[in-house]
From Swiss-Prot:
SUPFAM superfamilies, per the entry: Zn-binding ribosomal proteins
A Gene Ontology BP annotation from the UniProt entry: translation
Family statement drawn from the similarity comment of this UniProt entry: Belongs to the eukaryotic ribosomal protein eL40 family.
Any GO CC annotation of this UniProt entry: ribosome
Keywords, ordered alphabetically: Ribonucleoprotein, Ribosomal protein
Protein name according to UniProt: Large ribosomal subunit protein eL40
NCBIfam families associated with the record: PRK04136.1 (NF003161)
Length: 51
């Protein structure tokens, strides 16, 4: 069931996509992370949003 309210949609997207993914071990990390919590790599990317 899609979310129609734009404020709730924005909140849900921010909650779901405001993470960083490690390119080495694919772990989810906090948005402000500089290193991976699992493998200590610095190779992080923001989670991609696919429409």
């Amino acid at each position: 069931m899609p979310i129609r309210d734009p404020e709730k949609l924005q909140l849900a997207l921010e909650h779901h996509f405001k993470v960083k993914i490690c390119r080495r071990c694919n772990a989810r990390n906090p948005w402000n992370a500089e290193r991976c919590r699992r493998c200590k790599s610095r190779d992080l990317r923001p989670k991609r949003y696919k429409k």
